[in-house]
Amino acid sequence: MEKPKYNRIVLKLSGEALAGEQGNGINPTVIQSIAKQVKEIAELDVEVAVVVGGGNLWRGKTGSDLGMDRATADYMGMLATVMNSLALQDSLETLGIQSRVQTSIEMRQVAEPYIRRKAIRHLEKKRVVIFAAGTGNPYFSTDTTAALRAAEIEADVILMAKNNVDGVYNADPRTDETAVKYEKLSYLDVLKDGLAVMDSTASSLCMDNDIPLIVFSIMEEGNIKRAVLGEQIGTIVRGK
């Protein structure tokens, strides 16, 4: 069996990653592909926690920009992440991978409430744990959720899977042909240069708790496994 570099990971999936090329909604083919990749690493005895965004269904900031109360818009976004999490859970269990959804906002008919010790126990039993509903508080992104949960469960790394870029660049590679991709960065570089990796709250939390971050493309099948095995893909962010 191949030996993974990391034993306990947090996989951060953007909502857009679940939409695939259609841009919004949940693409069943894409979510099945992601579930198969998660199965690959679960079979290496890696403990897998997942944080899913909700941008394929709703963005709190968009609602706020249109005049909605920001807190209400953010709560709607949290509910969108629950829908995505349940879809991912279903795909995983179709493949025979036991999983649990834990929500920051209680909805016991749908999922377990988030309890740190229980989440760790699930991971130790090799169940995939999907953290839904963000932090349970408005004004905090799902990037911050990933950083917070990674600190709480003492994860070895955060794998940030992107659907539109394969790492961190000094400019937007979709609009600037001269954009240069970084292989390694520090969190101070990210904060100082305002690089679009994750928001500053999440970056600070990762830096303060010394949690490495790997940013890579989800669109190339097998990349999650490559990252877990320690292959050089995407961009790694760590330290001060």
Curated annotation (Swiss-Prot):
GO terms for molecular function: ATP binding; UMP kinase activity. Its main location: cytoplasm. ATP binds at residues 12-15, 55, 59, 163, 169, 172. This is Uridylate kinase. The gene is pyrH. It comes from Bacillus licheniformis (strain ATCC 14580 / DSM 13 / JCM 2505 / CCUG 7422 / NBRC 12200 / NCIMB 9375 / NCTC 10341 / NRRL NRS-1264 / Gibson 46). Allosterically activated by GTP. Inhibited by UTP. GO terms for cellular component: cytoplasm. Pathway: Pyrimidine metabolism; CTP biosynthesis via de novo pathway; UDP from UMP (UMPK route): step 1/1. The lineage of its organism: Bacteria, Bacillati, Bacillota, Bacilli, Bacillales. GO terms for biological process: 'de novo' CTP biosynthetic process; UDP biosynthetic process. Keywords: Allosteric enzyme, ATP-binding, Cytoplasm, Kinase, Nucleotide-binding, Pyrimidine biosynthesis, Transferase.
